[in-house]
């Protein structure tokens, strides 16, 4: 909810979300590189001790960053004072918020696709490619594209003036790139495989920035449409949608692997290998294209948003 309270300027919100995503990708890249060596250094006598100490260090850094953010950030948007509103009333309000509904559907698909594929990635490299260590190379290849992709959201948005359409384009290109990965593998075509992995991550990072940049603008639209401003509820509800997608995606993968005879640390049968391969490439690829189609219908562009903000300011003055 913090981004929506810091500014109502749609371009400033785009900058804030871009900075957040780029910083997150940089942090993820650093963590991916240093975590295993750090565990080995701190847990020279016991891996268990190493994991514990690294978790404590990361937890302290995480808490310190949150306290710093709390202390140094100011809310600039004046929130209307109102009495406590029931969940029923808030649900009725968000159901009238068409841009938000599209963003919510996008988040459910996002959670389903992203976490379902993430749950499959180690299975894919271990059993389909035959070597779990390939995952390390894969992780290294996607770090830089992740950072650049996140930074590219803002210039694409400036060109299109529509965050939903921007997210749609990134989702479409993510899906196409992921579908192309089906035709390559690490053993026979490593250069093409890792190149496509980087391209896929580039487009995904742009989408990841765009989808979260949409939500604050939906809050203003909802207030204009219904007279009710409920930042916290909308953020919580969209987060719930993402988690529901995550739960379904990961559970479905586990159920399919179990049904078709997956046995840990053994040679897998062709059906299981096929599930692992398609869950890494074609299935998420198709779902990303579906996500792109959904978000294509997001029509709250920059011009319309600015008109809504002006209406809200006039109404508050009255």
What are these regions (language model features)?
Residues 148-165:
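Helix-to-loop junctions at the C-terminal end of transmembrane segments
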Residues 17-38, 62, 139-143, 237-257:
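Glycine-rich segments within core transmembrane alpha-helices of 12-TM secondary carriers
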Residues 1-8, 206-226:
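Intracellular juxtamembrane helix-capping segments at the cytosolic ends
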Residues 172-188:
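C-terminal ends and interior cores of transmembrane alpha-helices
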Residues 183-197, 207, 212-213:
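Helix-loop junctions at membrane interfaces in 12-TM secondary transporters
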């Amino acid at each position: 909810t913090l981004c929506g309270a810091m500014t109502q300027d749609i371009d400033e919100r785009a900058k804030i979300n871009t900075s957040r995503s780029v910083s997150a990708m940089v942090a993820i890249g650093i963590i991916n590189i240093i975590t295993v060596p750090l565990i080995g250094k701190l847990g020279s006598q016991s891996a268990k001790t190493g994991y514990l100490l690294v978790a404590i260090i990361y937890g302290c850094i995480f808490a310190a960053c949150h306290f710093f953010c709390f202390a140094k950030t100011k809310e600039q948007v004046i929130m209307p004072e109102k009495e406590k509103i029931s969940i029923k009333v808030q649900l009725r309000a968000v159901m009238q918020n068409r841009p938000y509904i599209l963003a919510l559907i996008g988040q459910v698909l996002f959670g389903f696709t992203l976490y379902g594929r993430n749950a499959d990635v180690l299975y894919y490299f271990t059993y389909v490619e035959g070597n779990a260590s390939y995952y390390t190379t894969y992780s290294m290849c996607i770090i830089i594209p992740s950072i650049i992709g996140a930074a590219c959201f803002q210039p694409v948005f400036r060109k299109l003036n529509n965050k939903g359409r921007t997210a749609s384009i990134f989702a479409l290109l993510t899906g196409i790139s992921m579908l192309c990965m089906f035709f390559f593998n690490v053993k026979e075509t490593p250069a093409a495989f890792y190149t496509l992995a980087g391209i896929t991550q580039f487009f995904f990072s742009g989408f990841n920035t765009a989808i979260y940049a949409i939500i604050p603008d939906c809050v203003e639209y909802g207030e204009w449409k219904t007279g009710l401003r409920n930042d916290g509820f909308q953020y919580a509800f969209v987060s719930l949608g993402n988690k529901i997608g995550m739960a379904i995606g990961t559970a479905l993968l586990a159920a399919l692997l179990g049904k078709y005879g997956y046995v840990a640390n053994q040679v897998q049968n062709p059906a299981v290998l096929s599930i692992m391969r398609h869950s890494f490439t074609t299935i998420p690829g198709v779902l990303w294209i579906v996500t792109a189609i959904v978000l294509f219908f997001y029509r709250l562009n920059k011009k319309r948003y600015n008109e809504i903000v002006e209406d809200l300011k006039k109404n508050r003055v009255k």
